[in-house]
From Swiss-Prot:
GO terms for cellular component: plasma membrane; proton-transporting ATP synthase complex. It is a multi-pass membrane protein. Belongs to the ATPase A chain family. One of its GO terms (molecular function) is proton-transporting ATP synthase activity, rotational mechanism. The keyword Cell membrane applies. This is ATP synthase subunit a. PROSITE patterns: ATPASE_A (PS00449). CDD domains: ATP-synt_Fo_a_6. It comes from the Bacteria. GO terms for biological process: proton motive force-driven plasma membrane ATP synthesis. The chain crosses the membrane at residues 44-64, 104-124, 161-181, 194-214, 233-253, 260-280. Its main location: membrane.
Length: 290
């Protein structure tokens, strides 16, 4: 790209989000550097992350709505086949892993799997195409733009916190506030002696609280870390491809395609893991005796 003159600048530009927030002069606008984005503080928005995640969510809804409207008992079309396979796969996963009763879990699991998969799949688009399109549309040759929402920890943590909120909600709904507090304070260590049990409460609470909080953090960081690393590999291959070394230029296309083929497994696996852990965590929240 013309906006970057060095490999370091190229990498930094591709790893920076399109950030909107309050500028140092008090006005609101887009940041044009990582330092400027940092100065915007907590209330800055990653416009590219929000835009792509919402757009892909809408695409998911429209595709499945279209398939539902055109569903037939006769010979199904390609879209209906795809949707039926997805629904059957997710439904089987929920039946195998979720041991409670809730009409919400299967639709939630389906939404998570397909939505995360679509966001991950954008990583297969060549790294320069979408940023260059953003430059052409905006007319700004220095504007940063990241299309893979799951390489932004804000997106993955936001989804994980939503799952965490459901865990807390169902834990209290199924077990009651007393049961939920008891789960945090009376396990894993217990004693028939009331005094000893009282002394164990702080230890139990510390262990269970850390375990509880670790669920959304690990859920978010696992998805973010794997997708960020995959995106970085694509960027590094692009840097080598454009380095001017002829022997590397010949290998660039091969490396890109080889990593893309392998990355198909990664993007699918990460969507599956996020979905399965969500199902397992919510199943644990529905269990009376944890």
């Amino acid at each position: 790209m013309s906006a970057e003159t060095t490999a370091s600048g190229y990498i930094q530009h591709h790893l920076q989000n399109l950030t909107f927030g309050q500028l140092p002069n008090g006005s609101w606008g887009f940041a044009h550097s990582a330092a400027e984005a940092k100065e915007m503080g907590f209330w800055a928005f990653h416009v590219d992350t929000l835009g792509w995640s919402v757009a892909l969510g809408v695409i998911f809804i429209l595709l499945f709505r279209m398939a539902a409207k055109k569903a037939t008992s006769g010979v199904p079309g390609a879209l209906q086949n795809f949707v039926e396979v997805m629904v059957g796969f997710v439904d089987g996963s929920v039946k195998d892993s979720f041991h409670g009763r809730s009409p919400v879990i299967a639709p939630l699991a389906l939404t998570i799997f397909v939505w995360v998969f679509l966001m991950n799949a954008i990583d297969l688009v060549p790294v320069d195409w979408i940023p260059q399109l953003a430059m052409l549309i905006s007319g700004d040759q220095h504007i940063p733009f990241r299309a893979v929402s799951t390489t932004d920890p804000n997106a993955t943590l936001g989804m994980a916190l939503s799952v965490f909120a459901l865990i807390i909600f169902y834990s209290i709904k199924v077990k009651g506030i007393g049961g939920f507090i008891g789960e945090l304070t009376l396990h894993p260590f217990g004693s028939k002696n009331i005094l000893v049990q009282a002394l164990l409460i702080p230890v139990n609470f510390l262990l269970e609280f850390v375990t509880l909080v670790a669920k959304p953090i690990s859920l978010a960081l696992r998805l973010f870390g794997n997708m960020y690393a995959g995106e970085l590999v694509f960027i590094l291959i692009a840097v080598m491809f454009g380095s001017g070394l002829l022997w590397l230029s010949g290998m660039g296309v091969v490396l890109q395609w080889a990593w893309a083929v392998f990355h198909i497994l990664i993007i699918t696996l990460q969507a599956f893991i996020f979905m399965m852990l969500t199902i397992v965590y919510l199943s644990m929240a529905h269990e009376e005796n944890h």
